[in-house]
Amino acid sequence: MKKITLLKMQGCPYCAQAFAAIKEVKAEYREFADMEVEIIDKKNDERAKDFEGKYYYVPSMFIDGEKVYEAHPGETYGECLLNVKKVFRAAI
């Protein structure tokens, strides 16, 4: 299984949406239930430096360091959910 990393920012409504989508995907699909997501706060975590220049918006999700999903302003929960599913499928 590949490593999933999520970059977030405290107070970001799209990040909250992504966390809800992750919870929903893990509950709905048994094969994703035990998958772990490394969470990195872009402002308060030194590990965020490893991702500089690879994204603009948060949340952004990476598989083994490669960006697979980046939210955009105005993104709906449905869009987020589809993208989170895509990330989890790609990480298997």
Regions found by a protein language model. Give the residues of each.
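Local sequence-structure signature of Cys/Sec-based thiol-disulfide redox active-site neighborhoods
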Residues: 1-28
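Hydrophobic beta-strand residues in large extracellular and virion-surface proteins
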Residues: 4-6, 37, 61-63, 88
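Short, glycine/charged-enriched secondary-structure capping and boundary segments
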Residues: 19-22, 52-55, 76-77
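Short, flexible, glycine/charge-rich loop motifs used to bind or transfer phosphoryl groups or to couple energy/partner
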Residues: 28, 50-51
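Thiol-based oxidoreductase modules, predominantly thioredoxin-like and allied folds used
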Residues: 31-47
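Structural micro-motif
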Residues: 51-63
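Non-catalytic, surface beta->alpha helical segment in thiol-disulfide oxidoreductase systems
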Residues: 63-92
